[in-house]
Design a protein with these regions (language model features):
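Short, basic/polar, glycine-containing "phosphate-handling" surface segments that engage DNA
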Residues: 2-13, 74-84, 89-242, 312-333, ...
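Active-site metal-binding core of divalent-cation-utilizing nuclease and nuclease-like domains
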Residues: 41-81
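Charged, often low-complexity linker/regulatory segments
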Residues: 1-50, 266
């Protein structure tokens, strides 16, 4: 049962006895609610009712953390001050906002610096602002009046369905409000929590004001926010998730860039989300953010206060500690992955979005670099200016940064090339490309590439009145569409920045001689953004399956299959030569449904290598052939199970001058 449902049932039952006092009788129900939520946090937070007088009066309760308790004792250590603040409880008939302004709460605040005020139906946090002054922070309202509250309590399941997710997220944030905020993963959790609140506010709300933006996004990205028969709302869910990701990662990106500009200013300087657009360098994200952050769009959806809370959260981050971790190259593992898992785990699963371990990224890029030298007679490998690279599903930019790092190492090894950093920057601008369809990872990819170049001493130039700013070759687009020239006049988009993004991405697709395509394509079938142009990529893998091979039931719907089709047909067909290196679902190696696909690989490529990493929960039970444990290679500290499907790394080379018989090799490994 949901914690809110339990709480409402308990307060309803207490009131129904007719013997309850207006306030104190409900303390146990409130404590149960807070303890149920508090035990899910790390460290856990425990509510203790009726605290001793420490010089400011007798708080109705306090929120403690484990280190404040004696071992094996339910009582706090003598003299322990509640680490997460105290609680002031009033009856449901009283006004929590008036209580928060009273002398008693001010006395508590003067001693404890954080007070949660509640009348059972309203919850209001009194904390401190950047200057250390008393201020009302976040609030949550379960019902507008006492009468409405008791009606809601009489229908606990219905009320919990309407409020449960947002309310529990609110309580978690309250209990974490006084905790030090230094680690990227903790900041990510708060950002995701606010984003979830925002997403819940716009679910089911008509968004006619955003129809123009929706149509422009579909045109710019080369996709349709479509539903399916099984889930008609799937595309709408993706669209709304895209909007929320854009708003919150736009704010986050602006905060990061604002910090870079204020390194030498007073640590007490404050970031303001309303000025975020001034700090965003990527035109597409800047335009999206500007459209979404207009008061006419935010205020009717109730998103202004959520963004105000987000601003307060970012302003209490210890920036020195945060950025010492963030810029060590762990931004993705410790920030984006926890964000997406906490924000929208369903979308993450639908799109098959998983963090790629750095060991895999390093291995694949190194293999590609070696094959360029050995198979295509390019002694400088990735550093050769004729080598154009594309990660068609670049996510947060891990492969792009590793390509640039490898490129820089080659230039340095040639004798300390004095222009090495400049040449790496030139590559990032003009021949190392990434495509991404989700705004949040797209923003992080730009941040990662930008930080890498900055650390090399070749930062991207910012926009000035006299010149256009520089940006990495990472584009927000559907990688699977837009490769063919339009049959009619190109549609003009309402927003120039979106048109510029679309046109730049299409220039890469149609005009750049892509030689290397690598990455970690999505694994799962996701029809929420399907387009007819995508399905054409898979058709060659179905030819003859029924008539020639007698395979009547087959499944080629997973997105990674489309990316193989893209690499084989679109890119190899355009340039006559290509190197493909993907880590993907390993089903294509042996599943009967993929027999035509395997035969096409053997006919279309000259050299092929496959590293089977196993790790499948269904086929191998996550065991090696020797019976040893075989966890997924995608297991991380924050996702210990990894993914269920087995994986494989492919490396396939097609040369302009074809060989008669392809060379192939394979290996089987755990992981």
């Amino acid at each position: 049962m949901h914690p809110l449902e339990i709480y409402l049932k308990e307060v309803h039952d207490i009131r129904a006895t007719g013997a309850a006092t207006p306030e104190t009788a409900y303390y146990p129900a409130l404590a149960n609610l807070l303890n149920e939520v508090g035990k899910t946090l790390k460290p856990k937070v425990k509510c203790i009712i009726s605290l001793k007088n420490r010089g400011a009066g007798l708080p109705d309760g306090g929120l403690f953390t484990p280190e404040q308790f004696q071992k094996s004792s339910p009582k706090p250590l003598p003299g322990a001050t509640p680490a997460r603040g105290v609680i002031e409880v009033k009856s449901a008939s009283e006004d929590a906002w008036l209580t928060a302004e009273g002398e008693q709460v001010s006395r508590y605040w003067g001693k404890y610096r954080q007070v949660l005020v509640t009348n059972l139906r309203d919850f209001l946090l009194v904390g401190q602002d950047a200057e250390g002054s008393q201020v009302k922070l976040e609030a949550y309202r379960l019902a507008d009046s006492e009468a409405d509250f008791w009606k809601a309590a009489a229908q606990p399941r219905k009320t919990a369905a309407a409020h449960g997710e947002r309310f529990v997220e609110y309580l978690k944030r309250i209990m974490l409000q006084a905790a030090p905020l230094t680690a990227p993963k903790d900041v990510a959790w708060f950002l995701a929590s606010y984003a979830r609140d925002a997403k819940a506010r716009i679910e089911g709300v008509a968004l006619p004001a955003l129809d123009t933006l929706r149509n422009a996004l579909e045109e710019a990205l080369g996709l349709k926010f479509e539903g399916t028969k099984a889930d008609p709302d799937k595309g709408e869910h993706f669209f709304r998730s895209t909007l929320v990701q854009t708003i919150f990662y736009g704010v986050f990106s602006a905060w990061v860039l604002w910090h870079k500009k204020h390194l030498h200013l007073n640590p007490k300087d404050r970031f303001h989300w309303r000025e975020a657009a001034w700090h965003l360098h990527v035109p597409m994200i800047k335009a999206l953010f500007e459209q979404l952050s207009l008061p006419s769009k935010l205020e009717p959806l109730g998103l202004v206060e959520v963004l105000d809370w987000t601003e307060t959260c970012l302003n209490r981050v210890s920036r020195a500690d945060f950025f010492s971790h963030f810029e060590e190259g762990h931004a993705v593992q410790y920030f984006y992955e926890p964000f997406l898992e906490a924000f929208d785990p369903k979308l993450r699963k639908d799109l098959g979005v998983w963090y790629t371990p750095p060991e895999i990224v390093h291995y694949m890029v190194a293999r590609v670099d070696a094959v360029l030298r050995q198979e295509l007679d390019l002694p400088d490998g990735l550093a050769d200016p004729r080598v154009y690279v594309l990660d068609p599903c670049c996510g947060t930019g891990a492969y792009l940064v590793e390509v640039l790092r490898r490129l820089h190492a080659t230039l340095q090894a040639r004798g300390g090339d004095g222009l090495a950093a400049h040449k790496v920057k030139l590559a990032a601008l003009s021949r190392v490309f990434g495509f991404e369809i989700m705004p949040a990872p797209f923003v992080v990819a730009h941040l990662q590439v930008g930080l890498f170049l900055q650390n090399l001493g070749a930062p991207l130039a910012e926009e000035t009145p006299a010149r256009k700013g520089e940006r990495a070759g990472v584009y927000l687009t559907n990688a699977l569409t837009g490769w063919e020239p339009p049959t009619g006049p190109k549609k003009q988009l309402l927003f120039p920045e979106m048109q510029e993004e679309r046109d730049a991405a299409e220039e890469v697709k149609r005009d750049k001689p892509i030689l290397v395509i690598l990455g970690n394509p999505p694994y799962n079938a996701f029809a929420g953004v399907s387009a007819a142009a995508e399905k054409i990529l898979v058709e060659p893998y179905k030819e003859g399956l029924v008539k020639k091979w007698g395979i009547k039931k087959f499944n080629l719907d997973d997105l990674y299959v489309r990316f193989f089709g893209l690499a084989e047909r679109r890119i190899a067909g355009m340039t006559g030569k290509v190197i493909v290196s993907f880590i993907s679902n390993f089903s294509y190696l042996g599943d009967p449904s993929f027999v035509v696909m395997r035969r096409r690989f053997l006919s279309e490529f000259d050299s092929l290598w496959f590293d089977c990493l196993n790790g499948d929960s269904r086929e191998t039970g996550k065991l090696t052939p020797e019976g040893k444990p075989d966890p997924s290679v995608f297991s991380t500290e924050y996702n210990k199970e990894g993914i269920r499907v087995g994986t494989a790394v492919c490396l396939m080379v097609r040369q302009k001058k074809r060989r008669g018989t392809p060379r192939s090799a394979s290996g089987i490994f755990g992981g």
